[in-house]
């Protein structure tokens, strides 16, 4: 049986996750199980993962700090930017143009910045919205 108190290899690491659906939250869940602090940023309407059912949402969010922010507003983007400035890892699942609109273009190029895990539906066409129903994080 998994016991979180025995898995602390990522203690002291902060993960900011604003990826939606399954792969991003699942990746964040794995990092949290290894001791990382996970901050999940959701839209004010909640994570679309909730449409899969409450048990699924709760399983993917267990142990995470949940913050709601409207990333389409200046205030929400400022809140996210502040979280990212303190993060060691950032998990996203948005198109490059959306990152640019949020002022986060080049997130992976920041000197001494966080590790950026970007989960996209199609690496050949990253601007095309999409989601692969198969999770490759296992």
Segment roles from a protein language model:
Residues 1-136:
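N-terminal helix-loop segment corresponding to the beta1-alpha1 unit
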